[in-house]
From Swiss-Prot:
Biological processes annotated in GO: cell division; proteolysis involved in protein catabolic process
Species lineage: Bacteria, Pseudomonadati, Pseudomonadota, Alphaproteobacteria, Rickettsiales
Gene Ontology MF annotations: ATP binding; ATP hydrolysis activity; ATP-dependent protein folding chaperone; protein dimerization activity; unfolded protein binding; zinc ion binding
GO cellular component: HslUV protease complex
A Pfam family hit: zf-C4_ClpX
Residue ranges of every copy of the ClpX-type ZB domain listed in the record: 1-52
NCBIfam families for the chain: clpX (TIGR00382), PRK05342.1 (NF003745)
Source species: Ehrlichia chaffeensis (strain ATCC CRL-10679 / Arkansas)
Protein name in UniProt: ATP-dependent Clp protease ATP-binding subunit ClpX
UniProt: Zn(2+) binding residues: 11, 14, 33, 36
Family listed: Belongs to the ClpX chaperone family.
SUPFAM superfamilies tied to this protein: Glucocorticoid receptor-like (DNA-binding domain), P-loop containing nucleoside triphosphate hydrolases
Length: 406
């Protein structure tokens, strides 16, 4: 290219001519200089770093658990297990570029515990702590592709939406799938009929959790068949599964009884243990109905115990966003000071423990307890304080009648 021609060409972005830059790259009717290329590269790298806050691993396992403690009461062992698993997962991601002879596998997690024990809250709080995109799905709504129901790819779409369709961010996110025990196959024997919501879903999930490049329809799969797909690599997405696994305790007891070789004390110890799920082995999950390949992709298994009365009482008041604090805030918006006697909280916790609905049952009881107050008190100029006493709670159990304290 002649000097005159070179100088007549300029960068389409910054306007500098060829002699003012080191390199000018030509495209169809446009030019870009090396300086603008460096600038664009820096912007892209900075944007990528902004979605990789966990790369710095500022939060160590102890610090992750400390934050979990602020929102989740009890379940100490599960919080410790999750803190270590998540820390190791993101430590693995931050060192993917480092050449190593040892390839570290992903540590997906299974949370086993009764309804209301805190499985969903733990997963959601983890995502908030780590500042990564988070998506939640119910395994009972999933079916194999081609059948009525939700495709596995729709879960990835939820994660994409949580990441504002930033693919890099989504590929480092967390997906929580609840009720995974409901997709166990109906029996250990292969059925002639198609199990589209059981083993078939496990097979579909298997491909995603072990790591694959999935084609995700941005508008939802079955309604818009001709749309363009977004490619998502699931290698580095952390999957957390949760389930109550009703009946698994019998399988665990049976295994211990069969392997005890006459040591009845060991069997009795397992049977009487409140948290029998802490003895769960992969073979128990296979016996329950999860396929071996699926179980093999979830190396971290931890159990959450049933919440007792004292823990439920703490849950009412201690977390940052506790139910008592939430209702106090609601009443405060109407210039009413809401107070609970300690004895009243104990009765509420005791009622929830009897119902065996865990922390979820606490909200239902409080809603019933405070319904009349929330209906009557707004706009009542002579009401500025409400005190919930033990007697009021006990009266609710009989007649649902409450009264106001002026």
């Amino acid at each position: 290219m002649a000097d005159n021609e070179k100088n007549s060409c300029s960068c389409s972005f910054c306007g500098k001519i060829h002699s003012e830059v080191r390199k000018l790259i030509a495209g169809p009717s446009v030019f870009i200089c090396n300086e603008c290329i460096d600038l664009c590269s820096g912007i892209l790298q900075e944007e990528s770093r902004s979605y990789k806050k966990t790369d710095t691993l500022k939060l160590k396992p102890k610090e992750i658990k400390k934050v979990l403690d602020e929102y989740v009461i009890g379940q100490e062992h599960s919080k410790k297990v999750l803190s270590v698993a998540v820390y190791n997962h993101y430590k693995r991601l931050s060192n993917l570029s480092v050449i190593s002879e040892v390839e570290i596998s992903k540590s997906n997690v299974l949370l086993i515990g009764p309804t209301g024990s805190g499985k969903t809250l733990l997963a959601r709080t983890l995502a908030r702590v780590l500042q990564v995109p988070f998506a939640m799905a119910d395994a009972t709504t999933l079916t194999e592709a081609g059948y009525v129901g939700e495709d596995v790819e729709n879960i990835l779409l939820k994660l994409l939406q949580a990441a504002n369709f930033n693919v890099d961010a989504a590929q480092r996110g967390i997906i929580y799938i609840d009720e995974v025990d409901k997709i166990s196959r109906k029996s250990e024997n292969t059925s002639i009929t198609r199990d589209v919501s059981g083993e078939g879903v496990q097979q579909a999930l298997l491909k995603v959790i072990e790591g694959t490049v999935s084609s995700v329809p941005p508008q939802g799969g079955r309604k818009h068949p001709h749309q363009e797909f977004i490619q998502i690599n699931t290698d580095n997405i952390l999957f957390i599964f949760g389930g109550a696994f009703d009946g698994l305790d019998k399988i665990i007891e049976s295994r211990h009884r069969g392997s005890s070789m006459g040591f009845e004390a060991n069997v009795q110890k397992v049977s009487k243990n409140k948290d029998i799920f802490c003895y769960t082995e992969p073979e128990d999950l296979v016996k329950f109905g999860l396929i071996p390949e699926f179980v093999g992709r979830i190396p971290v298994i931890t159990s959450l115990g049933e919440l007792d009365e004292s823990t439920l009482c703490r849950i009412l008041v201690e977390p940052k966003n506790s139910l008592v604090k939430q209702y106090k805030k609601l009443f405060e918006m109407d210039n009413i000071n809401l107070q609970f006697d300690d004895s009243a909280l104990s009765v509420i916790a005791k009622k929830a423990a009897v119902r065996k609905t865990g922390a979820r049952g606490l909200r239902a009881i409080l809603e019933a307890l405070l319904l009349d107050l929330m209906f009557e008190s707004p706009g009542s100029s002579d009401v500025n304080q409400v005190v919930i006493s033990k007697e009021m709670v006990e009266e609710l159990m009989v007649s649902s009648h409450l009264f106001l304290k002026h």
